[in-house]
């Protein structure tokens, strides 16, 4: 009888034991879920145009909040000083030269070669739901649009810039409507484009909150036309023109970034989501941008320029509970580096093809880690630049300028005559690089 009772007890214990194993397996699976990743990419934002970068006349609490919850970079460079090639660096982890697109995509061009492998393609292959929301500017033919480049979902405009209410291409005529959702033209006349972006992102997050997702949230702001909210236009009314118009538009942008972050919080995904923030390049001084408004702070130059004001940009990464918070990194890093960094953080196998980016995880985790790059090259029109360590050489035709950046942030003292050996060294390395990519300087 006692033996039979023992058997009965074992029979009742066994299901409980199996249940425990099942629960432990479920917990392990949940804890092993890979993080979501969102890249917030602003357009034409100046080098220091955030409070945390030293701006005293701007209200940017949401951008600053990301810095408080993450790591902020002080020597972060875009891959190029203009829109399209900068985005090539971000999307492919390759320099614009290796990515096949040196300048902005003209209307009669296909765009970035379709054989380039984007971060979205890698994420999608790894089981991520992928979305492009906002500006594209890497091609508007069927083989180069977002849905053909790894994005499950796409909403936004394909060319360089639009009016934020009519959604018409804002450049040379004839102006054309440019708002698309997954290859189909859609119309939201009178609705503010950044608001549409937040709404689209919120719906995508809600739909995919139970699986890992990747969102490329590419704002068309504060790129002209400056269309700040009335409350911010009033708030900044006493700032000098055109800073007042730019500032209002930037704070309007900050509001929408805050709205996006609220969507993540409301979904309960704040601690499960990597947020990366970067401007595509420096602020614009074009006529349509009222010849300025943005600030490079102590730096020289602006959009299109290879001086620091054209290529040194604000950049932040935040992942609460997993990465350092409220810390600053002074190492050199570039927009090409987000590709391998995200791959490592999301535990996705590294790219099998050659990329130029380096994972920033060692730098993110330690202020004493070495810079990701010993040397980096840029090109804009007929000008090229190379930085190695503290030295930067800018060349245009026969003109050469050598700067000691840590001691000359404004690039005002040309040291060509004082350090001819460094000029020749960097000139030689530059020549080798441009020959390797099949381009002359």
Model-derived features: where do they sit?
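Formylglycine-dependent sulfatase
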Residues: 10-15, 28-400, 405-441
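Bacterial N-terminal signal peptides
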Residues: 17-26
């Amino acid at each position: 009888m006692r033996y039979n009772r023992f058997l009965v007890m074992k029979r009742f214990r066994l299901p409980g034991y199996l249940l425990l194993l099942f629960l432990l397996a479920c917990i392990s699976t949940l804890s092993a879920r890979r993080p979501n990743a969102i890249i917030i990419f602003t357009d034409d934002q100046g080098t220091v145009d955030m409070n945390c970068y030293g701006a005293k006349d701007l209200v940017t609490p949401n951008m600053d909040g990301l810095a408080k919850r993450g790591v902020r970079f002080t020597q972060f460079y875009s891959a190029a000083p203009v829109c399209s090639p900068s985005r090539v660096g971000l999307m492919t982890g390759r320099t614009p030269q290796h990515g096949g697109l040196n300048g902005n995509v003209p209307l009669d061009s296909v765009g970035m070669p379709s054989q380039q492998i984007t971060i979205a393609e890698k994420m999608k292959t790894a089981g991520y739901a992928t979305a492009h929301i906002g500006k594209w500017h890497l091609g508007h033919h069927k083989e180069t649009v977002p849905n053909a480049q790894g994005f499950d979902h796409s909403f936004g405009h394909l060319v360089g810039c639009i009016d934020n209410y009519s959604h018409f291409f804002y450049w040379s005529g004839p102006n054309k409507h440019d708002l698309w959702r997954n290859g189909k033209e859609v119309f939201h006349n009178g609705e503010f484009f950044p608001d549409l972006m937040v709404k689209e992102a919120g719906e995508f997050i809600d739909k995919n909150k139970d699986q890992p997702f990747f969102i490329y949230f590419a704002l068309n702001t504060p790129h002209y036309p400056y269309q700040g909210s009335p409350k911010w236009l009033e708030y900044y009314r006493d700032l000098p023109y055109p800073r007042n118009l730019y500032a209002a538009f930037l704070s309007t942008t900050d509001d929408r970034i805050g709205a996006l972050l609220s969507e993540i919080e409301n979904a309960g995904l704040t601690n499960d989501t990597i947020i990366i923030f970067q401007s595509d390049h420096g602020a614009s001084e074009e006529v349509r941008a009222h010849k300025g408004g943005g600030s490079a702070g102590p730096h020289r130059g602006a959009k299109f320029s290879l001086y620091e004001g054209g290529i040194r940009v604000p950049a932040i990464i935040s992942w609460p509970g997993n990465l350092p918070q409220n810390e600053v990194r002074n190492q050199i890093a570039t927009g090409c580096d987000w590709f391998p960094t995200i791959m490592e953080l999301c535990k996705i196998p590294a790219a099998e093809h050659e990329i130029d980016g380096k994972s920033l995880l060692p730098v993110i985790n330690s202020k004493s880690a070495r810079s990701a790059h010993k040397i980096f090259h840029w090109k804009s029109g007929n000008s090229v630049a190379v930085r190695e360590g503290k030295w930067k050489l800018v060349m245009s035709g026969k003109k050469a300028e050598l700067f000691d950046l840590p001691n000359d942030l404004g690039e005002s003292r040309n040291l060509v005559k004082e350090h001819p050996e460094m000029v020749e060294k960097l000139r030689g390395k530059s020549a080798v690089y441009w020959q390797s990519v099949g381009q002359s300087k």
